[in-house]
Amino acid sequence: GDILSTRDAELSFSVEVSGSAPIERIELRNGLETLETFRPFEVASLGKRIRVIWEGSEYRGRGRETHWDGCAELCGNTFIKVLPINRYNLSKLFDQQSPTKIKWESLTTGGFAGFDAFLSERDNGVLKIRTELIEEEINIKDVGLEDLMFENGGINRRIRVFRMLDKNSHVALKIERRFPLKSNMDNAFYVCVTQEDGHLTWS
């Protein structure tokens, strides 16, 4: 948290990460602004794994709980395997009821939860997600590297859907960037690392 003064117009920013699980993404930030979202893989290497995340809260303080009880159904494709993310309350239902349907109970208070779905076909079919807050139908072929985001007010209360590697082996990496410095304010550079297992690391 040191505060430094400089007359330079740019900053050289180096990040080295050694994770306890494969790395999903690294966000490079200056204050509230995300300057870059780095992923350790390319679009061409993405596989049949779809990640569905629900997150956020109603507001800060009491009553911030957001309930995400719902289900997901596949039409024109099947689930080979489904793995929950951040399922800490084991009394909450998470069940693959058939090759085409998942049902769950979940709540968030600002963090996130969700699941990885390994599909039998990479690009076929439609994923139907139904919760009390959000209902969406998503063409599997449209799911790629960047998040498909479906908002519902509150504080970052939304569902995100994106595609992953079938097997991610990127546990450690180093990146370097140069970013311009804003002259009219303090520049607070930091990183947020998201691991595949749902854990976050902040600098």
Where are these predicted regions, by residue range?
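C-terminal functional module detector
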Residues: 1-203
